[in-house]
Amino acid sequence: MPISTPALLVHTAGQAFERGSVERRDVGPNDVLIDIAYAGICHSDIHQAREEWGRAIFPMVPGHEIAGIVREVGADVTKHAVGDRVGIGCFVDSCRECENCLAGEEQFCLKGSVATYNGR
């Protein structure tokens, strides 16, 4: 069953943020569901919300530096437990095997990194 989450949304480029909700998928075996307590809005979010970089996906929930508490973990998750306090940066996954990842530069993953915002 999808999870309804309150959010500040931008529906089109340049629109003001408005309160709403988004539907999230069920927690999968490798997922961690977090009750978000804080999310930062930085200038890259504003660029995205204004469609200044040409890659925006709408509707958009700006804010990609996140802090909260783990509500649920998938069956295969071993590093987090319900109740853990967590912080999430801009990138949440990469191949962890290519030259860039091994050098600690996951944002330049040669196989593609997973960002926390804008579906990219």
What kind of region is each of these model predictions?
Residues 9-12, 50, 70, 102:
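Residue-level signal for short segments within beta-strands and strand-turn junctions
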Residues 21-23:
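Generic structural detector for well-ordered beta-strands
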Residues 14-19, 43-44:
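Short N-terminal binding/cap micro-motifs at the start of the first secondary-structure element
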Residues 25-39, 52-99, 107:
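Glycine-rich beta-strand-centered segment in the early N-terminal region that forms part
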Residues 44-50:
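Cytochrome P450 core scaffold surrounding the K-helix E-X-X-R motif
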Residues 16, 94-120:
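NAD(P)H dinucleotide-binding glycine-rich loop of Rossmann-like/cofactor-binding domains
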